[in-house]
Amino acid sequence: MMLEHVLILSAYLFSIGIYGLITSRNMVRALMCLELILNAVNMNLIKFSDLFDSRQLKGDIFSIFVIAIAAAEAAIGPAIVSSIHRNRKSTRINQSNLLNK
């Protein structure tokens, strides 16, 4: 795939993720938008790693670490949201002020 196509697709995914993070009021939707942002970054890492030096796999290895962190976030994030929903009866971001009891 050509560099321009990957960059356009990655910018599109990143923009959707940022827009979703800014406008979403639901924690689950915010986690999904964060995953979109991380996937857009991974696409850039892999494509630029292939473009500049295809023999060294620095971008590929770094993207594997980002995927591992995203997997941990995907495992822990819904558990935290479930706990907040159980205690606060809402998953809306603007209603969950955890500093006040």
UniProtKB/Swiss-Prot annotation:
It catalyses: a plastoquinone + NADH + (n+1) H(+)(in) = a plastoquinol + NAD(+) + n H(+)(out); a plastoquinone + NADPH + (n+1) H(+)(in) = a plastoquinol + NADP(+) + n H(+)(out). InterPro entries: NADH_UbQ_OxRdtase_chain4L/K (IPR001133), NUOK/Mnh_C1-like (IPR039428). One of its GO terms (biological process) is ATP synthesis coupled electron transport. This is NAD(P)H-quinone oxidoreductase subunit 4L, chloroplastic. NDH shuttles electrons from NAD(P)H:plastoquinone, via FMN and iron-sulfur (Fe-S) centers, to quinones in the photosynthetic chain and possibly in a chloroplast respiratory chain. The immediate electron acceptor for the enzyme in this species is believed to be plastoquinone. Couples the redox reaction to proton translocation, and thus conserves the redox energy in a proton gradient. GO terms for molecular function: oxidoreductase activity, acting on NAD(P)H, quinone or similar compound as acceptor; quinone binding. It is found in: Plastid, Chloroplast thylakoid membrane. GO terms for cellular component: chloroplast thylakoid membrane; NADH dehydrogenase complex. Its EC number is 7.1.1.-. Belongs to the complex I subunit 4L family. It is an enzyme of class 7 (translocase). Its main location: plastid. NCBIfam families: PRK05715.1-2 (NF004320). The chain crosses the membrane at residues 2-22, 27-46, 61-81. It comes from Drimys granadensis. Keywords: Chloroplast, Membrane, NAD, NADP, Plastid, Plastoquinone, Quinone, Thylakoid, Translocase, Transmembrane, Transmembrane helix, Transport. NDH is composed of at least 16 different subunits, 5 of which are encoded in the nucleus. It is a multi-pass membrane protein.
